[in-house]
Amino acid sequence: MAAQGFLLIATFLLVLMVLARPLGSGLARLINDIPLPGTTGVERVLFRALGVSDREMNWKQYLCAILGLNMLGLAVLFFMLLGQHYLPLNPQQLPGLSWDLALNTAVSFVTNTNWQSYSGETTLSYFSQMAGLTVQNFLSAASGIAVIFALIRAFTRQSMSTLGNAWVDLLRITLWVLVPVALLIALFFIQQGALQNFLPYQAVNTVEGAQQLLPMGPVASQEAIKMLGTNGGGFFNANSSHPFENPTALTNFVQMLAIFLIPTALCFAFGEVMGDRRQGRMLLWAMSVIFVICVGVVMWAEVQGNPHLLALGTDSSINMEGKESRFGVLVSSLFAVVTTAASCGAVIAMHDSFTALGGMVPMWLMQIGEVVFGGVGSGLYGMMLFVLLAVFIAGLMIGRTPEYLGKKIDVREMKLTALAILVTPTLVLMGAALAMMTDAGRSAMLNPGPHGFSEVLYAVSSAANNNGSAFAGLSANSPFWNCLLAFCMFVGRFGVIIPVMAIAGSLVSKKSQAASSGTLPTHGPLFVGLLIGTVLLVGALTFIPALALGPVAEYLS
């Protein structure tokens, strides 16, 4: 079993790196504001037709463009969900959503979280799924990538005030990265057996003679960008464990690759743009070390079996509860870590049914800020915050003004870095405390004791860090939970983007300093260890008390 797990992890990472490297080169061209070959004429026509100016923006203008697009998308999606019964492509005549569920869902998909307090096949029409959710899957992913584009440019430019043009970046990211790759993935899913139709639900007779209603819909097209954009919201309630979404072991492997593809490619692009590929490899090493350790821990915990069943004298050699037998425990464990290391949230197994230790690792990966590969764009700019913090700590230890890639890291940058890092832990801890203090919060818990608290902590961690997965034992479709989680998702997304853009605006105005004998190298194993230690230290200090009340207490009981 250990050899199989090692081979699975090694194969996954090897294929991932091979695919991400050329994509990273394409992203590097876009960051450097160089159109991809053959796209210049199309871009010129589109920009003219849409009235888009290619004039560069400062950080405030860039931020306002990103926020404006997302707020407009939020309003449109909210009213679309409220009135979906008036809109076309609704063969099941599904009614509009309640205001609180519509708000929660709109915020969820605009912020790239894709938390779902509903069952897709019984709640949303085809039009809502396509024109509402799928569109936001593209736009939210493009927004995250655009933000990291701006931050990377802040390190490459000197004594400037501009970071690029948000509209140009968003169009290029969507047209030349997200749409083509998602189209290829969708066609592959269709070839493998994923649904893509507009038929009404089909009544069929089962082998036992009973009747069953099979849901239909344009699944493959949404499934592709759901994974590629690290969105995670499933067309069906069972998400990627549903055979209509994820029909074969091969599609399952491609889905995991799609989740990590752009975050990995962005690391390669970062090194290429900086003119020092070692900088990108340093980030990949730090992310990969944490990732491999976490996968190993979850695999080990799930292979040990369910201790509660063992205590009852029942055979439980491996913990298969809540897992698809066609994927097995090792693949389910790998998928769980992939989807929570990235801000995806798609699942092929029920995380609520994992062992205490096996469920704690995905929760902790979210709590440290989704920086282990992370979401498209958001993962890299989240890790860059920890890089700045690590550089600052190193500067304190050696008594020098910290600098990174030639840019001095001053008080302003560190205040903004601390603010961005503290946003999500504050939301998680205060949100969980509020839920446990109120009847409306506690009434959603279906399990008592430490596991019930783990369900609450997981939900708030997932929302605040824009992941979207859940311990499904929590009944979260109520006004209290819909509003609480919507607030956490909104602030957790934009409360980090705003200080990140402010950091970019501050750095782009500075001159680059030549490296000296006292400059800390940020590309070697020493800095990789320092960066990993910084991530672990912040995560440990912040969340160990809360984790001790939930999964740790459950593990020890």
Curated annotation (Swiss-Prot):
GO terms for biological process: monoatomic cation transmembrane transport; potassium ion transmembrane transport; potassium ion transport. The chain crosses the membrane at residues 3-27, 62-84, 126-149, 166-192, 250-269, 280-300, 357-368, 415-435, 480-501, 525-552. Residues 1-2, 85-125, 193-249, 301-356, 436-479, 553-557 are periplasmic. Its main location: membrane. It is found in: Cell inner membrane. Keywords: Cell inner membrane, Cell membrane, Ion transport, Membrane, Potassium, Potassium transport, Transmembrane, Transmembrane helix, Transport. It is a multi-pass membrane protein. GO terms for cellular component: plasma membrane; potassium ion-transporting ATPase complex; potassium:proton antiporter complex. Has two separate and distinct potassium-binding sites. One site is formed by three periplasmic loops and is inferred to be the site of initial binding. The other site is cytoplasmic. Part of the high-affinity ATP-driven potassium transport (or Kdp) system, which catalyzes the hydrolysis of ATP coupled with the electrogenic transport of potassium into the cytoplasm. This subunit binds the periplasmic potassium ions and delivers the ions to the membrane domain of KdpB through an intramembrane tunnel. This is Potassium-transporting ATPase potassium-binding subunit. It comes from Escherichia coli (strain K12). The lineage of its organism: Bacteria, Pseudomonadati, Pseudomonadota, Gammaproteobacteria, Enterobacterales.
